[in-house]
Curated annotation (Swiss-Prot):
The lineage of its organism: Eukaryota, Fungi, Dikarya, Ascomycota, Pezizomycotina. Residues 16-88 form a propeptide. Its main location: secreted. Disulfide bonds join 322-326. Its cofactor is Zn(2+). This is Leucine aminopeptidase 1. It comes from Podospora anserina (strain S / ATCC MYA-4624 / DSM 980 / FGSC 10383) (Pleurage anserina).
Amino acid sequence: MKASLLALLLPAVSARNVNLAGDTQRPMTHEEAAAATYHIEISPGNTRWVTEDEKWALRRKGINFFDITDHPDLGATINTLVGPPKKKAVFPKKPTYQDAVKPLFTNLSKSHLEENLEKFTSFHTRYYKSDWGRQSSEWLLGKVQETIKEAGAEKYVTAKHFKHPWGQNSIIATIPGKTNQTVVIGAHQDSINLFLPSILAAPGADDDGSGTVTILEALRVILQSKDIVKGKHPNTLEFHWYSAEEGGLLGSQAIFSAYEKERRDVKAMLQQDMTGFITRTIQAGLPESVGVIVDFVDPKLTEFIKKIITEYCDIPFVETKCGYACSDHASASKAGYPSAFVIESAFEYSDNHIHTTDDLIKYLSFDHMIQHAKLTLAFAYELAFADFPALEKGK
């Protein structure tokens, strides 16, 4: 790359917003961006200050982290005496709503998954600081709202942005239950090219376009249950699409920080991040499977998810690990909420095209994504109707 071209690109690569009087913003100059530092946590209690370029260098090395600059106190109330103590997580011993859930599976659609993913990957990038990232979030919110309206559920179900200062907002769809006990299903909507995030294409088909459309499809189908739409279930369901996961779990930290401060009663959170790539698993001579993350997760919730997969999916699960702060479930966990994470395969066989221009639909299996949609749908329905107070009393 010629030096003159590099000089033109650097300001765009490092651009960040600066707050001015009256809540207006302007991009940072290159000098300001070069001087900006971020406080990150790469393992529990192991923090350091880095520049933005150093953040991306760590990610290129496969090192994940929380960017705790704006939320250094996430999880601070867990061990305090403020408010009632958190109850231990308890989940059903086995799935019990097969008669309601399995008939819904016939409505899951590969064509819906593909159509939505084609559109979602058509944005040049979904980098959270880019205007494309803002546009993709606006499109996604519109699609979620359209899904709710087509189900005739707009009187009961809501979808709205959770706003962030960097431009790309997170999205929360809420299906109210009889109580504020809440079950969360999440995916992240942003994508990134780790070499020139503000400039190079980042279609993000698998990471995490696949998870985004997977939980959208699960939402579409669960809204075909009249009992769910009319709120006959005791527990509230929320579907989250997080912004800025790639920047250090920024969007999910903001949401779960707010929930922690509000003392929201989140009973369970499941993250779907990368749900479509099976090529390396098959090439290794291994069976197609769902990867169940077993490190830095809630073990009881994870055991329940294994039972969901065994009961409702057509393929087995494999236990795997992904390390600290590897996706948005980590924000829920840090805030004190039981969280779990499933991925497309054993971690070592997951998609090797991510974070580049080559994270494309052509490498993905929509049949495999349907398995993740079945898991998501069953998980949501089973826990929507779970009697958590009785479970916590040992009944």
